[in-house]
Curated annotation (Swiss-Prot):
Alphabetized UniProt keyword annotations: Cell membrane, Membrane, Transmembrane, Transmembrane helix
Organism listed in the record: Synechocystis sp. (strain ATCC 27184 / PCC 6803 / Kazusa)
Domain of life: Bacteria
Domain Rhodanese per the UniProt entry, residue ranges: 21-109
Intracellular or extracellular location(s): Cell membrane
A GO CC annotation given for this chain: plasma membrane
Membrane topology: Multi-pass membrane protein
Protein's name according to its UniProt entry: Uncharacterized protein slr1261
């Protein structure tokens, strides 16, 4: 069911699916291209939040544009940005792709898609922490600093919502997806 407040409009996954079957909505995925390639809702357009431009937003007469992301945080931000730019007739998916999948609704998964940025961050951060602990234990205690540095970076990422390691990894050639 769609709900409305002055700053936010959401739609539940099951309601969105009903509207999709009636061809009454346009879906826009605001996650990054690498995430979109890995898995997305059928017939969704990719328009990453990092490159959000109101003039590129797909819209059609008589259809509601529905934004979504992984959990609805980025789509909520995109909704606010678009509304501030004067765009009307947009809402976002409550709970994002996670809620969509939890409701048992279908997605498109790309076989052999690259590992998600967040999994890459977890692999690298875990490896650096383990390396720092092992080197600190068996080589020199100064290597514990490496584990502490990574821990501080993860703490900052959690508190700020900005992960510098993810930003850097996203710039690597193997993480670049052509739109």
């Amino acid at each position: 069911m769609a709900s409305s407040t002055q700053t936010n409009v959401t739609i539940a996954p099951k309601t969105l699916q009903q509207l999709r079957q009636q061809d009454a909505v346009i879906l826009v995925d605001v996650r990054e291209p690498l995430e979109f390639v890995g898995e997305h809702i059928t017939d969704a357009y990719s328009l990453p939040l990092s490159r959000l431009n109101p003039s590129q937003l797909p819209q059609a007469e008589g259809k509601t544009t529905v934004l979504y992301c992984q959990s609805s945080n980025r789509s909520g931000n995109a909704l606010q940005q678009l509304r501030s730019a004067g765009v009307e007739g947009i809402i976002h998916l409550e709970g994002g792709l996670l809620a969509w999948k939890q409701a048992g609704l279908p997605t498109v998964k790309t076989k052999n898609a690259p590992i998600s940025i967040m999994r890459q961050v977890q692999i690298i951060a875990g490896s650096l922490v383990l390396t720092g602990v092992l080197l600190g234990s068996f080589v020199a205690p100064g290597f514990y600093f490496l584990s502490g540095f990574v821990g501080a970076g993860l703490l900052f990422a959690g508190l700020s919502g900005t992960c510098m390691m993810a930003n850097l990894l996203g710039k690597l050639p193997y993480n670049q997806i052509k739109d």
